[in-house]
Amino acid sequence: MQIRYFLALSLLPNIVLADEPTTTEAPSLQCVVAPPVSRSFEDREALTGISDDQIVIISDHSSVAYNNQAEFSGDVSFSQGLRHIAADNAVLDQKEQRLNADGNLIFKDELFTVTADTLEAQMSTNNATLKGAQYWLHGQQVHGDAEKLQITSDNNLLLTKTNFTTCPPGDESWLLEADMIKIDSKEEWGEIWNAKLRIANIPVLYIPYMTVPVSDKRKTGFLFPSFSTSTTNGVEVSTPYYWNIAPEFDLTFTPDFMSSRGLYTKTEFRYLAGEQQNGQFNVEYLGSDSKLTSNADRYLYHWSHQGAVNKNWRVRSDYTDVSDNNYFNDLNSDVNQSTDNQLSRIGEASYFERDWDFNMRVQDIKVLGEDEKPYQVMPQLNFNYRSADIFNTIDFKFNSELTNFRHQDNEYNTATRLHLVPSLIWPIQGPAGSFTSEVKLLQTQYWQQNIDEDSTLNDSISRTIPQARLHGQVNFERATQLFDEQYRQTLEPQIQYLYVGYEDQSNIGIYDTAQLQEDYYGLFRDRQYSGLDRVADANQFTLGFTTRLFDQTNREKLKFSVGQIMYLEDSKVSIDDTYEETAQSTSVLAAELDAQLYNDWFVSGSVQHDTETGENKKNEVTLDYRPSSDRLLQLSYRYVPDLLNTNTNDQVDISQAGVRTSWPISDNLYFVGNYYYDLNESRNIETYTGVQYESCCWALRLSYHYRIKTNYDDDLSESIDGREEFESGVYLNFVIKGLGGSGPLGVDDMLNEGLFNYRKPLYLRN
């Protein structure tokens, strides 16, 4: 079992680009850390008509000596601009421009409040030294003690023999002690030398140098290190370094030493390009992975970019590459999750006008663990035109696509495809229904190259397919009563007739085409396959209806849909042209349900049932109990037959049941857990259990996970059998709150831990 203890001391801000608008959620719990207030401050604030450079002194008693020294006593208030000093006694040397004060001393300006035993201030330079000080940063939870506190002329703080915390006074949950701390008020950042972290008054960590934020402002420097140990990776030490290059650029470099694997480095560079574009680069590298017998180098490259060039042009790019199929399984990448098995590489530029648009795209998809590689789109050009209300009744659309398919393996054939689709639509809209008539002409031209001599493919193919579609829907409504409650019920039947002409397409290769799902909304599609390499002939009716229940406040309480296709003729087109399908008179019966059963109980489900064979093609159901936003209990089941196992190329049935919960044990203590079980294999495939305690200044999370791993064949291991089938681990996270952008751990991210992330399954219109 993998055992991992992770100490995440999140003294770090949520690093964002400075020019990028952000919102920071307020912590759910905040410590009340209030600095002391002197009555003399209120007396000073009551005075008006005083400029910032004038000095105001208020006291019960005063005297002036022959040597230009003035002495004040009894509730002394000394003010200049935004700086205020309250004390029992004060001496002002006008010649030396020096002020000394003691006795119940309080210093305050716009950034911090300090109490101290003594104060010595140089008014000409705005420097001040306070001894025996306690300090509070305004607008933050940060406060602490210092043997000596110096305020510089530019309003920075220099603290000697000091400490700080974000917990309330008297709460020693955590405390950071240091020989010296410098707080830059302009940069809103702190530098710390020779720091010692105490948790529950026990020293747990020594740090010779570190930087921390005192606000959300970013600054170059080392971020707080993280430490972990595991039986898989050994001892891990990560020390991120953040470089604030410019307002529009920043970089984070994270060396992560793993005793079982070696030095793993992660670099992230982010940028803003103008006002409407942004992107980032990621480079991750592990040299000579000592965990593998081959000691192979492992790496990742990633680039993403998106935005608008002007009001018409949009651009987007995304590229990721890894060294091996199991990169995400073995390493904690910042780019993808361990369950991701596809890397999409895409570059796209689009131009938009009111009546037309144009798009250019190149795409390559890398599928991890599969020997057969998909075709590359190099490139694809799309042009679309639309004109509404021709003769005040008819809409005209013209869609076109020119695609060049290439393959990394030279043994595969390649192709260029031109697809043109003019269409006429006659929509009729009424207050209680609609009827749409549509005709299309699908004209496609293929030029195929590198064809084997024994292949059935042709060099040049022209395909012309007519299509007609009629779709009508009526909305009925009535008042009804259910369980002594008044509701408004709708009945929304719809019917569609679809005709698609037949043409033999066995001489066309498969480049980007796959079977589409037959859910309820898919029954009313005009196509059976994605892509354009196969256009299934059709002569069919689709019947379906949806019914809804609305309460008296117009909140949707139930939605149920069911539908089925009736085939007038058998389709003669399939992806596998050698496979003869069994003639069926109907499609699957597809039904979907979303309902609020009672107060806090919700159910959601779908089924695809073959009425001719009596078998279910797919079904899933979830039952949710949500009495409040932080309380959840979810039961789920899903069944999918004949799913392809990419490792073995076998067909497998998926039959899985699960339970997921999030529940507060007390005001500060939460429990999150999930459990998923494979009914066919009779085994646990995932367990996650976590408890989290959160106070106003710190949070602690302890969690355990056990889950099946998705391992792939690759060149780095002799066989897939040598890899662990399951992964388990224990995690301990400790988070400090109240500094900069640091906030609560939150429960939502715990719900999303694991293979089966939580998703709210309800689609009621509320």
UniProtKB/Swiss-Prot annotation:
Secretion signal, residue range per the UniProt entry: 1-18
Q: Which residues cross the membrane?
A: none
Q: Can you name a GO cellular component term?
A: cell outer membrane
Keywords assigned: Cell outer membrane, Membrane, Signal
Q: Where in the cell is it found?
A: Cell outer membrane
Q: Do you know which NCBIfam families this protein is assigned to?
A: PRK03761.1
Q: How does it assemble?
A: Component of the lipopolysaccharide transport and assembly complex. Interacts with LptE and LptA.
> Which family is annotated?
Belongs to the LptD family.
Q: What is this protein called?
A: LPS-assembly protein LptD
List the source organism. Shewanella frigidimarina (strain NCIMB 400)
